[in-house]
Amino acid sequence: MRKILFFGLLSICIFLVFFFYKQKENNIIYNKIVEEFEDNIFIDETYTHLFKDSNLKELVFIKSQLIIPELEHKEMMKSTGYYADTYRALSTVYKFDFKVHENKILGFKSVIFEGFEDAKVSKHENNLPSEKWQQLKDFNIGDPNINEKFFHLEFPFVVKNTLRVTISKGFFKKIKKLKRLKIMLISNEDREYKIDIENFLPKYNL
C-alpha cells in the first residue's frame, strides 16, 4: 500500500514539474480565479508573458471583474453620483504590469502603444477608489517621480521594478483589435524597453 501511495505521489510530482516547465518554455502563463462571497462574484484573470533576452522580464495583463447583482439592474447602471460612478468604473478593471530588472530604482515617464501615439495619458497614483480614478483617460501610468529621491542610487543586486498601467474600457476595446501588441516604455533615464508580441487578448477572450 505504501509503495502504491509513494509511486502515485511521485507521478503527480513529475506531472506538475512537466506542466510548469512546459508553461515556462512557451513563455506563457494564464490563470483564472473565480471567488464568490455572499451573492457577489469576483473574477480575476491574469496572462503573463515571460521574456528571456531583455531587462524587461515580464508583461502581465490583469482583468478583474466585480459583479454585485443588486447593482446590475438598468436603473442603477444609468444613474449618476459617486456610488454609481464608482461601481461602473470598478466593475471591470484592466491593467498591465511591466516588470523591469535593473540595478536601480526606475521611474517611467512615458508608455507608447504603437498605433495610438495620440492616446490620452494620466499620471496620478493608482490608488482605488478615488475621484481621479473615475476620470481615467485612455490609460494611467501613475506618478513617474514617486521614487525620485532614489533614482541616483545603484545597487549591487537586481531591483525588480514594476510599472502598473491601468487601461480604460474604451482604450481596451481599441487595443484588443490589434494583431500585435507593440509597446514601448521610456524610463526616467530615457532608456527604452520595447515589446512586440502577438495580441493575446482575443485568444483568451479577455
UniProtKB/Swiss-Prot annotation:
Record localization: Cell outer membrane
Signal peptide region: 1-19
Pfam families (UniProt xref): BPTA (PF17044)
Alphabetically ordered keywords of this record: Cell outer membrane, Membrane, Signal, Virulence
Entry GO CC: cell outer membrane
InterPro entries reported for this sequence: BptA
Statement: the UniProt record of this protein carries the keyword Membrane: yes
Top-level taxon of origin: Bacteria
Disulphide connectivity of cysteines: none
Chief location: membrane
Family matches, as NCBIfam families: VirAssocBptA (NF045772)
Family label: Belongs to the BptA family.
Functional summary from the UniProt entry: Virulence-associated protein essential for survival of the bacterium within the tick host and therefore within the natural life cycle of the Lyme disease spirochete.
Protein name in UniProt: Protein BptA
Organism: Borreliella garinii
